[in-house]
């Protein structure tokens, strides 16, 4: 069965696939009336872009190290009475999903109706949970990282990304995207062609979701990491950060999943890692075989595993070419 037929028969929500081998495009195809120039909301792939921005912020001296306490970046934040945990949570805890939160189930309605998603996240950080235990925070909590970037660089997250990551890679992310109600938010989830990055009412860009990229944009970001942070004759992210952020830093033991700094570690033997988002969005890098696979997808609630698709159906075609 051809790759195109496989997509149409089993992975019907895929918008585009780009495969790079040895820095060259060896496959590029689009589906569902999508085109190469249409950005797609990539959901949690956004997290790995935030990881890149933290590497750049550290390289430029805005942030000293990952052991700095989160609360130190928010001097005006008033810690709740009897709170004894938030004071000890570090940037590294946020990047490795080893920070505790006070909620059991995500309080999305209350969170998204607030004007300041960073403060709302701080209000939910800490509590009685144990620092160091893996707890994946898909949306609520991760925006604290955006607040840290803003408070250290003096720029919005989008501005900092445009200057230091997107522009050097010739990636266009035009504007902040705002929602007036939940209907607009759900419409955005299913949309294609909106060029921007979701922001809260204060203008703070989301850290865990909300970025729109074309499939080729995603491939470029993967290629940047395949090449150890160097692309277009420029060291955009330090080699040290690329290596550190794509090594195992924490483990989601109940699911046997390994995590770096906002990157999923797929296979340590072939040095493969991935940025993964809802709906089946993926940036996959196999450093050993010099392969990058980018898959953009239109949102549906449940999809077949993209890593399995890449490893079983895409990699074997191009591995030895």
Give the ranges of each region predicted by the language model.
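Active-site Gly/Thr loop motif
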Residues: 186-205, 243-292
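Active-site-proximal loop and beta-strand segments within enzyme catalytic domains
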Residues: 5, 10, 36-42, 46, ...
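Alpha-helical scaffold elements that line and support the substrate/ligand-binding pocket
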Residues: 23, 43-62, 94, 135-166, ...
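Active-site helix/loop module of the DD-peptidase/beta-lactamase fold
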Residues: 60-99, 152-208
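Catalytic-site signature segments of enzymes, centered on catalytic residues
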Residues: 36-37, 104-180, 204-209
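A short, well-structured edge-of-sheet supersecondary motif
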Residues: 3-34, 183, 283-284, 290-294
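Flexible, glycine-rich surface segments
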Residues: 176-185, 193-237, 241-242, 246
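Structured C-terminal helix/loop/strand segments within mature extracytoplasmic catalytic/sensor domains
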Residues: 272-321
């Amino acid at each position: 069965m051809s790759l195109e037929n496989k997509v149409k028969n089993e992975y019907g929500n895929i918008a585009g696939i780009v495969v790079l081998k040895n820095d060259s495009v060896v496959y590029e195809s689009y589906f569902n009336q999508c085109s190469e120039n249409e950005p797609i909301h990539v959901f949690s792939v956004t997290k790995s872009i935030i990881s890149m921005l933290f590497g750049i912020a550290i390289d430029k001296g805005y942030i000293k190290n990952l052991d700095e306490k989160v609360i130190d970046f928010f001097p005006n934040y008033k810690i709740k009475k009897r709170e004894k945990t938030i004071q000890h949570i570090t940037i590294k805890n946020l990047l490795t999903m080893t920070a505790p939160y006070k909620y059991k189930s995500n309080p999305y309605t209350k969170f998204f109706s607030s004007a300041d998603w960073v403060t709302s996240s701080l209000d939910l950080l800490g509590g009685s949970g144990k620092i160091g235990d893996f707890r994946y925070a898909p949306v609520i909590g991760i925006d604290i990282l955006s607040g840290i970037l803003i408070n250290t660089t003096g720029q919005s997250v989008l501005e900092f990304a445009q200057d230091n990551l997107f522009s050097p890679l010739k990636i266009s992310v035009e504007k902040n995207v705002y929602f007036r109600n939940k209907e607009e938010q759900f419409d955005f989830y299913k949309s294609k062609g909106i060029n921007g990055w979701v922001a809260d009412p204060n203008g703070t860009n989301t850290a865990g979701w909300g970025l729109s990229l074309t499939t080729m944009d995603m491939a470029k970001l993967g290629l940047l990491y395949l090449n150890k942070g160097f692309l277009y004759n420029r060291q955009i992210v330090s080699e040290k950060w690329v290596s550190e952020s794509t090594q195992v830093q924490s483990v989601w033991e109940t699911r046997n999943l390994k995590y770096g700094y906002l990157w999923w570690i797929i296979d340590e033997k072939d040095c493969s890692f991935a940025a993964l988002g809802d709906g089946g969005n993926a940036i996959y890098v196999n450093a050993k075989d010099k392969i990058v696979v980018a898959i953009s997808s239109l949102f549906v609630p449940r999809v077949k595993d993209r890593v399995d698709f890449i490893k079983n159906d895409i990699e074997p075609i191009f591995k030895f070419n």
